[in-house]
């Protein structure tokens, strides 16, 4: 393989739902490594804290990355996985960081969807906006122009906070769940 795509899925995804794009990765000769968070897919356990979630992602990365020493590694986050991808990319500096439908923070995303829920009840704030300025790798942001779950304005806000080379691509007529079509 030429390199690795380290994939962090969204809330509705798991290892099984993302294997549909495998042909693309085969064609470009990149291996795909998908992390299933605790309690997702066939992974057991329960997410107890944001710190635990970040630690799990880092442990998975540390287990696979040495096999690709000297080869490009792309960290790819989708929706929920974007905040986790930003934190990891900030710490390990991959060749490229790809964020699809990213949020500025989970608290902000949650309050937009459920404005009646007190902010302190949001268990995992995952402040992407507070971390992305520390990323030194190039960043590609992809967002559906008709995303009603996480608005494209979140990608625009994140783009403005990135200090590394950054590109934002808005996908016309795509929403949150169909951006990969």
What are these regions (language model features)?
Residues 21, 128, 137, 151-160:
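Short alpha-helix in the alpha/beta-hydrolase fold that links the catalytic acid
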Residues 1-63, 67, 71, 89:
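Membrane-embedded segments
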Residues 174-181:
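Catalytic histidine-centered segment of alpha/beta-hydrolase-like enzymes
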Residues 134-136, 141-143, 147:
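Short beta-strand/loop motif that positions the catalytic acidic residue
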């Amino acid at each position: 393989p030429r390199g690795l795509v380290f994939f962090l899925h969204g809330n509705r995804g798991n290892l099984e739902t993302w294997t549909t794009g495998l042909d693309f990765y085969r064609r470009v000769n990149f291996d795909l490594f998908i992390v299933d968070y605790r309690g997702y897919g066939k992974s057991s356990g329960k997410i107890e804290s944001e710190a635990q979630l970040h630690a799990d992602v880092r442990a998975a990365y540390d287990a696979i990355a040495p096999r690709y020493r000297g080869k490009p590694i792309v960290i790819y986050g989708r929706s929920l996985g974007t905040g986790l991808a930003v934190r990891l990319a900030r710490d390990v500096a991959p060749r490229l960081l790809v964020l699809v439908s990213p949020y500025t923070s989970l608290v902000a995303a949650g309050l937009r969807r459920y404005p009646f829920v007190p902010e302190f009840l949001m268990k995992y704030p995952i402040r992407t906006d507070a971390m992305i300025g520390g990323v030194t790798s190039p960043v590609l942001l992809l967002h559906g122009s008709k995303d009603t779950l996480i608005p494209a304005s979140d990608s625009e806000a994140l783009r403005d906070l990135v200090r590394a080379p950054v590109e934002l691509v808005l996908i016309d007529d795509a929403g949150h769940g169909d951006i990969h079509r």
